[in-house]
From Swiss-Prot:
Residues 14-126 form the PX domain. Residues 433-551 are annotated as: Disordered. One of its GO terms (cellular component) is cytoplasm. It is found in: Cytoplasm; Cell membrane. Residues 549-568 form the WH2 domain. Belongs to the protein kinase superfamily. PANTHER family: PX DOMAIN-CONTAINING PROTEIN KINASE-LIKE PROTEIN (PTHR22999:SF40), PX SERINE/THREONINE KINASE PXK (PTHR22999). Residues 483-514 have a biased composition (Low complexity). The protein kinase domain is predicted to be catalytically inactive. Residues 88-481 form the Protein kinase domain. The keyword DNA-binding does not apply. It is a peripheral membrane protein. This is PX domain-containing protein kinase-like protein. It comes from Rattus norvegicus.
Length: 580
């Protein structure tokens, strides 16, 4: 792919690692049985959901298929009599919901083909073993020296990747394993670059990479052949498992698990970090490190499945690191996955959840230090260390590796540029998915907080306080409105409230009624003996209010008095003497 050339348009492929959630919404009783309506959702978007209808017998069939795991799953028991009662159906519906919750909480079970077909039959109805056989048969037409011995059924966790035990016709005792895989959602290479890089893998030589004997690819899949190893993978060593057994049987509920000795942890860890650094320096994206992808050859670990990133397949731990926005490059993904691997080597089992709040006692504090730098809350929040930084930590810095094999992996400049662009596209999709999950988590937390009992109580208290405050404000506004009305009514002619005949005490709300009444006014002066002709009689004095209400109103009127509201008056002076 040329510089700055956009990846070719392609159809959107399903990411099998995106978690499915299922909710039993309702039930409907027919003549002889009951059907349960289940809402299934892929990922965080409610728009990406659908309904399925399942009977109890379908659940029972799924449960029988999962017995290979050895897990005791909480499927509600069968009932022959009274199984159509309303109360029984409601109780069974709750039990079936709990059954689905337990399965989907298990990382291995949630990714298995049995559950995917049960919940999403439209996308998982194909028989990938038959598809793989067809592709392999077409390949054998041009390469007749290979022969299929038997299919290795379900030895891996991927739904769209199948394995076959092979042999060469002229070397019947030598056993090989063929892996066939479909394209994944992160395939951003052009078809030409993709096929060239797949065919380049047999030329990769490194003491800690498991050799590829043969590799070829079509526009839609890839096929690789490697030597079959009877000892199996690092995960087989930890879980005491047989390599040919199904993945669910080997790793879902192992009877015996054992962590490795400290020296093994140091040696294997150093070897794996060295090969990761080699790939990072070459610009080759990996992102698929886990214990089942590390082959054991004597006392040496060798990395498997370099083709996965070229095919665009999602990582085994993708549902973990999509929760943390700082794990947003393939290098940081490799370091985080190394933390999972180191935990499994140390304790003989994967962590119950990630991030890990506290680590159990280990054979060395140096082990815990590396685990804390890759799996702790702080590490997941702030970001992963580099591979070079891990190599400098005390757990690995003093490990001496002795090997005579010189690493070789020549990638042409054009293909290296294509890998760089594809890597950026993979990281961009990862970043976008992490952003969506982060926004969804914030929205969910806000909705949960808004609907919590504590938040409802707080809103009730605030509403009560607001109601009391409004009532107080309304009660304070009433006297003001009353005084304004009185003021506007007496602002024209003379009014007893504006009479200056008696002073009024300072107004204080609530105190006017408590003050003693004023002393009675002095008696009016005696009237004149007789009015002179043409003079007007003075108006008789008005009675003065003696109750507290009128006193308060009087004070309010005086305080609110505005000179501009008075009407202009025309004065007629009759004091001048009249001359007859």
């Amino acid at each position: 792919m040329a510089f700055m050339e956009k990846p070719p348009a392609r159809k959107v492929l399903l990411d099998d690692t995106v978690p499915l959630t299922a909710a039993v919404e309702a039930s409907q009783s027919l003549q002889s049985h009951t059907e349960y309506i289940i809402r299934v959702q892929r990922g965080i978007s409610a728009e990406n959901s659908w309904q399925i209808v399942r009977r109890y017998s379908d659940f029972d069939l799924l449960n029988n298929s999962l017995q290979i795991t050895g897990l005791s799953l909480p499927l509600p028991p069968k009932k022959l009599i009274g199984n159509m009662d309303r109360e029984f159906i409601a109780e069974r519906q709750k039990g079936l919901q709990n059954y689905l919750n337990v399965i989907m909480a298990n990382h291995v079970l949630s990714n298995c083909e049995l559950l995917k077909k049960f919940l999403d039959p439209n996308n998982y109805s194909a028989n990938y073993t038959e598809i793989a056989l067809q592709q392999v048969s077409m390949f054998f037409r041009s390469e007749p020296k290979w022969e299929v011995v038997e299919p290795l059924k379900d030895i891996g966790w991927r739904i769209r990747k199948k394995y076959f035990l092979m042999k060469i016709k002229n070397q019947p005792k030598e056993r090989l394993v063929l892996s066939w895989a479909d394209l994944g959602p992160d395939k951003y290479l052009s078809d030409k670059d993709f096929q060239c890089l797949i065919k380049l893998l047999p030329s990769c030589v490194h003491p800690y990479i498991y050799r590829v004997t043969f590799a070829t690819a079509s526009e839609s899949s890839a096929l690789l052949i490697r030597t079959f190893n009877d000892k199996g993978t690092l995960k087989d060593l930890i879980y005491k498992a047989k390599p040919k057994d199904p993945f669910l049987k080997k790793y879902c509920n192992p009877k015996k698990t054992q962590g490795l000795e400290l020296q093994q942890i140091k040696t294997y860890g150093r070897q794996i970090l060295e090969v990761l650094k080699f790939l990072h320096d070459k610009g080759f994206p990996y992102g698929h490190l886990h214990a089942a992808n590390v082959m054991l050859d004597g006392n040496t670990c060798r990395l498997l499945d370099l083709e996965n990133s070229l095919l665009g397949l999602p990582s085994f731990y993708r549902s973990y690191f999509t929760q943390f926005r700082k794990i947003n490059t393939l290098e940081s993904v490799d370091v985080h996955c190394f933390g999972h691997l180191l935990y499994e080597m140390t304790y003989g089992r994967p962590p119950d959840s990630v991030p890990v709040d506290s680590f159990p006692p280990a054979s060395s504090m140096a082990v815990v230090a590396v685990l804390e730098s890759t799996l702790s809350c702080e590490a997941c929040k702030n970001g992963m260390p580099t591979v070079s930084r891990l190599l400098q930590m005390p757990l690995f810095s003093d490990v001496l590796l002795t090997t005579s094999e010189k690493p070789q992996f020549k990638i042409p400049t054009k293909l290296r540029e294509a890998l760089r662009i594809a890597k950026e596209c993979i990281e961009k999709r990862l970043t976008e998915e992490q952003k969506q999950i982060h926004q969804h988590r914030r929205l969910t937390r806000a909705q949960s907080h808004h609907g919590s009992e504590e938040e409802r109580k707080r809103r009730k208290i605030l509403a009560r306080k607001k109601s009391k405050r409004s009532a107080v404000e309304n009660s304070e506004e009433q006297p003001v409105k009353h005084s304004n009305a009185n003021n506007s009514a007496g602002s024209g002619a003379s009014s007893p409230l504006t009479s200056p005949s008696s002073p009024t005490p300072p107004s204080t709300a609530g105190l006017s009624s408590a003050l003693p009444p004023p002393p009675p006014p002095p008696p009016p002066p005696p009237p004149p003996a007789g009015p002179s002709p043409g003079t007007e009689m003075p108006a008789p004095p008005l009675p003065q209010a003696v109750n507290g209400v009128n006193r308060g109103a009087l004070l309010s009127s005086i305080q609110n008095f505005q000179k501009g509201t008075l009407r202009k008056a025309k004065t007629c002076d009759h004091s001048a003497p009249k001359i007859g």
